[in-house]
Amino acid sequence: MIDKKQKQKIVSEFGKNESDTGSVGVQIALITGRIKYLTEHLKTNKKDHSSKRGLLKLVGQRRSLLRYYQKKDLEAYRILISKLGLRK
């Protein structure tokens, strides 16, 4: 799981200020961090089906947030996906 220091680092990097935890960019970045952690976890624990289900749920949640962000603010969306390395 992402610890408190990593969350603060993500919030300070992608948020407008230190306490900006609810903006779409921060939410997408936090979900991406959790997805990366679960992906590594599932490489060693292949039979952990509940974590796999949680991973798929997070991917769907991130996809819907990305779709919303793309419609809302295209330029910020492009900056975010380039920072996170999500698309080519």
UniProtKB/Swiss-Prot annotation:
It holds the Pfam family Ribosomal_S15. GO terms for molecular function: rRNA binding; structural constituent of ribosome. SUPFAM superfamilies: S15/NS1 RNA-binding domain. It comes from Borrelia garinii subsp. bavariensis (strain ATCC BAA-2496 / DSM 23469 / PBi) (Borreliella bavariensis). PANTHER family: RIBOSOMAL PROTEIN S15, BACTERIAL AND ORGANELLAR, SMALL RIBOSOMAL SUBUNIT PROTEIN US15M. GO terms for biological process: translation. Keywords: Ribonucleoprotein, Ribosomal protein, RNA-binding, rRNA-binding. Part of the 30S ribosomal subunit. Forms a bridge to the 50S subunit in the 70S ribosome, contacting the 23S rRNA. GO terms for cellular component: cytosolic small ribosomal subunit. SMART domains: Ribosomal_S15. Belongs to the universal ribosomal protein uS15 family. One of the primary rRNA binding proteins, it binds directly to 16S rRNA where it helps nucleate assembly of the platform of the 30S subunit by binding and bridging several RNA helices of the 16S rRNA. This is Small ribosomal subunit protein uS15.
